[in-house]
Amino acid sequence: MVRPVFDAAVLSGRSDIPSQFIWPEGESPTPDAAEELHVPLINIGGMLSGDAAAAAEVTRLVGEACERHGFFQVVNHGIDAELLADAHRCVDNFFTMPLPEKQRALRRPGESCGYASSFTGRFASKLPWKETLSFRSCPSDPALVVDYIVATLGEDHRRLGEVYARYCSEMSRLSLEIMEVLGESLGVGRAHYRRFFEGNDSIMRLNYYPPCQRPLETLGTGPHCDPTSLTILHQDNVGGLQVHTEGRWRSIRPRADAFVVNIGDTFMALSNGRYKSCLHRAVVNSRVPRKSLAFFLCPEMDKVVAPPGTLVDASNPRAYPDFTWRSLLDFTQKHYRADMKTLEVFSSWIVQQQQGQLALQPAMT
C-alpha cells in the first residue's frame, strides 16, 4: 500500500481524501457529540496562597474530577498572556511553512520527537488528520529546546526555540504546583509527587489540525489515553477536544484564560489506579484550522514508577507493576499504538518479560 503524504496545503481543500484517513463507522465522530462536559475550574493561585478554605475546596474538586474522568481546568495560573500569544503565533509560523521546510525536523521511526505529518510513517490506517512538532524539555538542561530547534530547523528559527523554552519552563513550574494539589488530594502530602517530578524529562507538542472537507469521517487524534503523567493543554478558540465519559463523547469548550489538565497513564499507576486516565480524542472541522499547545509531564527516563506505600493495602493491592518511563515510552513508540488499553497491555507485557527472564535464569547458572 502506498503511504499518503499529508500536505495540509493540498489536502485541506479536497473532498477526495485518501482512504487511510477515513475512520470506520462507529469510531468516527457524530454531530451529537457537541454536548459540553463541565469540568471543575481550579483556582491554582488560591490553592497556593495559603488560604485554607480555598485549598480545601480545590483539593476536593480535583479529587472528585480525577476519580471520575481525570479532567479539570486551571485558572489564575500565573502564565503571562503575552507568552501564550507568542506561543500560538509560533504554531502558525511553523505549520504554515512549506512542507519541505517542516520536514527538516522530520521525526525518525521509533522516536518521540520531531515533525510528523499525520504519522504516515508509523501507521497504515485510521490516520490522524493533523501535523505535530514535538521536542523534549528538561529543567536540568535549559538550553535543550533552543538547541534542538536550531539544530533541526536552522538559526533563523532561534526565536521559536526561545519562546518554547520559556513556555516549557512555565509549564514545568505549573505542573509541579498541580502535583502538590494531586498529592494533597490523595492524602500523601504536597511534597511527594512534586519531589518525584522535579527533575522531569517532559515532552512539548505543537498540534495543528487543518480543515477537512469530510470532518464526520476523520479524526484529528483518535481515541486514546495519554501514556504520560500529566497533560497541560492550551487550546485556541476553535473547539475540538472531546472526552468519553458516562458512555458518550462530550466536548470541553476552549477558554483563553484556562489550561485543560488531564491525568495520564503514568500518574494513574503512581496513584495505584485511584485517579483515572480517561479516553479522549480531537475532532476537526471543514472551515478553519485548530491549534493547541500540549505539555506532557514525564518523569526522568529511568526513574521507577510506583505508588507510595500509603496507597497500597489489603483492600487496595498493587494495580500495576513497577516500570520506568523509558520502558513505557519505548513500548508506545515501537510496539503499540497508544489507545484506551495502553497501560493494561503494557503491564501484561512487563509481567511476560519478567517471567521470561526468570525462566532463563536456571539455564544461565
Swiss-Prot record:
Fe2OG dioxygenase domain span: 199-299
Reactions catalysed according to its record = gibberellin A12 + 2 2-oxoglutarate + 3 O2 + H(+) = gibberellin A9 + 2 succinate + 3 CO2 + 2 H2O; gibberellin A53 + 2 2-oxoglutarate + 3 O2 + H(+) = gibberellin A20 + 2 succinate + 3 CO2 + 2 H2O
> Which cofactors are named for this entry?
Fe cation; L-ascorbate
Residues the record marks as active site: R290
Keywords assigned: Iron, Metal-binding, Oxidoreductase
Intrachain S-S bonds: none
Its domain of life reads Eukaryota
Q: Which GO terms describe its molecular function?
A: gibberellin 20-oxidase activity; metal ion binding
* Keyword Cell membrane part of the UniProt annotation: no
Q: Does the keyword Metal-binding apply?
A: yes
- Which InterPro entries has this protein been placed in? DIOX_N, IPNS-like_FE2OG_OXY, IPNS-like_sf, Iron_ascorbate_oxido_reductase, Oxoglu/Fe-dep_dioxygenase_dom
UniProt record similarity statement: Belongs to the iron/ascorbate-dependent oxidoreductase family. GA20OX subfamily.
By what name is this protein known? Gibberellin 20 oxidase 1-A
Encoding gene per record: GA20ox1A
